[in-house]
Amino acid sequence: MSDCCNDLGPLGREEVDVLHVSRGVSRRDFLRGAAGAAGLTAIGGLVSPVWGQQKRVRLAFCSQLLCVVPYEATRAAGFFAEEGLDVELVYTRGGSAALQALNGGAVDYAATSFDAALNAFSNGADIVRFASTGRLPLFALATSPDLADEIKGVEALEGRTIGVSALGNADHAFMLYLLERAGVDPDSVEFATVGTNLYDAIRLGQLDAGMVQEPALTLLQERGSRVLVNGMDIDDANEYLGGAYEFMGVATRRGELEERNDEMQALARALGKGLRFVQSTTPERLVESLPSEIITGGDRDRLANTLERYRESLYPTAVDMNLDAMQRVIDVNRAAGGRGGNVDLDRIVAPEVVG
């Protein structure tokens, strides 16, 4: 989930609140499977890379599982190493923290939602986006189980209480846009900000509806909730947004574009291979590529099923940025009254990096 960057300030390396760090390639049996799934022959030689010959870079992102899949798959399959990069994947507490780390020089790159990047840019962060790894938002609008038969569309939310992670976040902006599209006055609904843990509040009927992520969405559906709009489904994105809605992607500091050009191209090539691998391998192998620390206690089979269901919709097969999808995010933020809606797209993108 993207988060608001209204309090953006630079963080030095020693100030970053790091939840987890991934680095290197995975064990040999994973790489053998990755090579077979991706039709590669040279990947096995990457099991023991000579790290002294790799260019060390730090890339920070939030810790939402579906956001990190392409990055961890790229790392685990050895595609970063294949491009001469030793990429340290730094897990932070949300997109704003990752962008603060980038803004302050603690990391070289930040992978966040485009909403978060727009908010950061509008608050003075001189960043530029050059690669895309996610083309849909990672949340859906679902009702409480008890109201599934009563609330059958967004228009029925008038006078209801709707849960979002926080006012100003991507899910809040998206919700405001959906209300406007359905002809519902946003002032007629009550927004409850309960962080990202909306599941229990919706399940228990404390909220009439809310913007949820996986696995909460699947769990609510199993209990009878109605899904009004699923941002993770390309068909719903086409119906409600007119197409893809730029989400995860990579940014760096604008002042370093020229000096990092070769490095950025190598990073983009590696991620492009990783995105294609995400579509070609098994969901179980994708789950295997994730650090055990971030799925401890989670249902690995459920996560694999989620990836099988959504990966084709969520993840592109190339890192080239879809400028129309990015403009949709700006338009949604503008409709919601967010500062990100005032950003000129040309000022925050560098599509020439990946051609």
Segments the model singles out, each with a brief description of its role:
Residues 1-29:
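N-terminal secretory signal peptides
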Residues 4-5, 51-193, 204, 208-214, ...:
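Short, glycine-/small- and polar/acidic-enriched structural segments
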Residues 22-23, 29-50:
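N-terminal export signals
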Residues 69, 135-141, 225-226, 246-250, ...:
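Small-molecule pocket liners
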Residues 197-203, 207-291:
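Pocket-lining segment of extracytoplasmic ligand-binding domains
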Residues 257-336:
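Secondary-structure end/capping motifs
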Residues 327-355:
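Conserved C-terminal helix/tail region of periplasmic/extracytoplasmic solute-binding proteins
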